[in-house]
Amino acid sequence: MKFVFTKFLYVIILLTIHSIGVGGVCFGQSTGKTVFVSSTEGDDGNSGESADTPLFSIKKALTVGDTILLKANDVFYERVELRKGKISSYGKGRKPVISGYKRIAKANWGAIDEHIWRICLTNDNYTGYDTDGSSLLNNVGCLHEYDKDLIHGRKLKHLSDLAEDWDIWQTEHHKKGEATDCDFDTLYLYLNDNPNFLRIEFSVGGIALRMSNAIIENVRIEGFGFGISAGRHSIIRKCEIDAIGGQIQLNNSQYVCYGNGIEFWIRNGLEDCLVEECKISRCYDCACTIQGREPDPPSYIRYRNNVIFDCCQAWEDFFTTDNPDAIFKDCIFENNVIVNSGNTTGFGYTKGRTKCCHVLENNYLGNKGMIFRNNTFVGGNYYCAAKYNGAFKSGVWEGNTCYIKRGEWLIRCINKGDEIIRIPVEKGNFRTLKAATDEAIRRYREMTGDETTRFVIKSDGNINKRIKKLKKQYSKR
């Protein structure tokens, strides 16, 4: 009797630990029905109860169960609202894809001027993501040459601004409340070559996945305005996020384009979240971020063991508040590998854009306590931050390593002028180049409070070899 009771108690303890999570992160385990979904073999009239009777759409599956399994190698052209449960995969092969790409079925670009082409986005000449006629979702972010896996696109404010290959334009109505569905019926492209001979698809606007109190794992997301917008108690694990953003941000009073890979927006008690072992690439803005409103500061958010390539920034954070006491509580960006930030995203940027770096902190009221720990940064400018009381002490830095080229900056100010501290390319007034370099790093440490980042200065060729090697290494994940 004693043995039975002890065994029963042990099981109860295990179940309790499993339900509340590990390390403060709530895993929100689902307890309902498991549903199989396949875009190649499924039908929404099926039961979805087995791999032999899968449903067709994720939307339908979410009305049936709360553990959703997507078939490997399949592509799902839809946006997802995940407010409980879990999305994962089944079968062998590549990760299933949630895609926002809208592919031209038969090339029909028309030339309207020298090097300027036009295409209608509302007809039925497309496969892939269906925007169903006039729609704000036709707010294109990038053009993807899918046979070469190249993305292009610099979205501009006026048609008359088109001047370089892959410049694109859609509407003059870009301020908050101005744009209608019809403003995005047509896309204009500047290109010296004839685009009718290229295999092109467009990324649509909107958010691929909104989630809270849920888990997503082993899924690829591509070709949307945003990748994942996550709330409290979210787990994102072993996912791929690629080709995100470039669209006009329509709720802004100024002309600006957007595009974040994984974003935690601060509201409603944002807490207990985890992003781990993901691969994030080619984001117009940042790969990873925590941002938004106080007075509900975020707590216990972890980004760890991720790989980030070719994004404008690997990390961004800010509070939309004037409260100097608002902080990131136990929020950590750690053990990540970040490669080639701000250099070759595939997107084009308007002249004067300065926020191209590994880490961007838009906090204007001092140190908010965001922790950067044991990360490796390779190729790209290091840190961009707001200056407060004469210093850039916006984060906590512990044990990071940065492989950096001469001429790239250690710190750049985003307010109160354009102050930059670079790794020098010449000795200047110093006796040696090493002395000039030591002084630049000393000034950086004094301004930021970062006493631990190890800066490894390498030649262009060495950095480029490291980037190539890392891309090859992590492409196999």
Language model features with spans:
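Extracellular polysaccharide-degrading/modifying enzymes targeting complex plant/algal/animal polysaccharides
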Residues: F36-S234, G245-G259, E263-W265, R406, ...
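Short glycine/acidic-rich loop motifs that flank beta-strands on beta-rich extracellular proteins
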Residues: R79-V80, G205-A208, F224-A230, G245-G261, ...
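Classical Sec-dependent N-terminal signal peptides that target proteins to the secretory pathway
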Residues: V4-V25
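Catalytic-core region of carbohydrate-active enzymes that cleave or remodel glycosidic bonds
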Residues: R373-G380, G390-K405
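Short "repeat-start/strand-capping" segments in structured domains, especially the N-termini
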Residues: L82-G85, S212-A214, A230-I235, E271-D272, ...
